[in-house]
Amino acid sequence: MQRFHTAVIGAGASGLVAAISAKRAKNTIIILERLPSIGKKLLACGGGRCNFLNDKIDESYYNLSARSLVKSAFSRFGKIEILRFFEELGLHHYCEQGRIFPVTNQASSVLKVLEIEIKRLSIPIEIGFEVADIVSSREGFLVSSSANKKIICDNIILAAGGRSYPALGSDGSCYKFCRSFGHRIIEAVPSAVPIEISDKTCHFLQGQKIFVCAKSLIDGKINSETRGELLFTKYGLSGTAILDISQDLSVALNREPRLPAQVLVDFAPFLDEADLKSELSSRIKAGFEPLDLLCGILPNKFGSAFLDLLKSKDPGKITTELKHKIFKALRTRGWNEAEFTCGGVDTSQISEKSLESKLKKKLYFCGEILDVEGRRGGYNLAWAFSSGFIAGLTE
């Protein structure tokens, strides 16, 4: 049976960086990956462009419960260190509205430079290794696969991800091993995910995109707000604006106690209410047909979608509806459509300095398996790289 200093479970963004970090520290390393290839989720990041970092990065862009842990990690391996790490691997980058991308605009470039470094360091990768059991003894950790392969190691780095995009490798199957060592799992719910809505407007405007101001309403109170693109779908709402506020909605809809969740949309954020009302009043007085009242303000199809409202020829009523349209959220879409996981291993049980378990010596965590969620825009990959590098500094 082969023995290693450290076994990294999971060959995603955090696991690959953890393995490189650990190997550079002169340790014997093995990567265990259940899929037939590595980095599949990384290849899908940013629509294949891989927004791997953000120009503005600190703990304030992450969930409140994780901020202390994130702050500690970034103080040791933050934006400057992440960029230097990839530059030394040969990856060139550029910044677009604060989001950092490889100059190739290909996620495969990010994965490839990591693969080249892993090969240079002679780090073995066991693909198709689905972990079935982890047993701890005085001699170390015995890791067994579903095919009855076994390895023994002194340290384990759990980098197996959360539950989003299970077809790409992260399905939450390693949470059970975390629990077996006493760790508490914050219930995982999908995040950066489309929302299902029951509203005829969504069906009528299916496929339409529009720039809006969107807010999440949880139990009648505004929780979050963003500006961005809204996309109407056959099942409800999607687009960047919805994905950005979906964490609050998902927690309310999927965790007990389940709370009423709504989406409040301003379809004309470029006009204040008084100006919109005045514009509509002028058009009504000028004899505009109801179907044409929104021409030049909203896409043409909106006239048909809101025709009953427009027929009222009441500028105040129309303005209120367009500036404060409320959609009742029924449910989130499933894990196959979620970009991130909200939830995971409770960060209060993890050492801020080393990312080692406070409950089990020589057990480390990194990446999305932890209850750490950043905003969209490169923050989650930044966490993956930072936490992976630090977890790899095992003693």
Language-model-derived ranges and their functions:
Residues F4-I31, A391-E395:
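N-terminal Rossmann-like FAD-binding beta1-loop-alpha1 element of flavoenzymes
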Residues A7-I9, L32, V131, K150-A167, ...:
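Short hydrophobic core segments
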Residues K23-G47:
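Glycine-rich FAD pyrophosphate-binding loop
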Residues P36-I38, L43-A44, F52-L53, D58-E59, ...:
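An anion/pyrophosphate-binding glycine-rich loop and adjacent beta-alpha core
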Residues G47-Q97:
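Glycine-rich active-site loop/strand segments that organize a redox cofactor
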Residues I127, K301-E373:
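A glycine-rich dinucleotide-binding beta-alpha-beta segment and adjacent secondary-structure elements
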Residues I127-G140:
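A conserved short coil-to-beta-strand element within the FAD-binding core of flavoproteins
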Residues N155-T201:
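Glycine-rich loop(s) and the adjacent beta-strand/alpha-helix scaffold that form part
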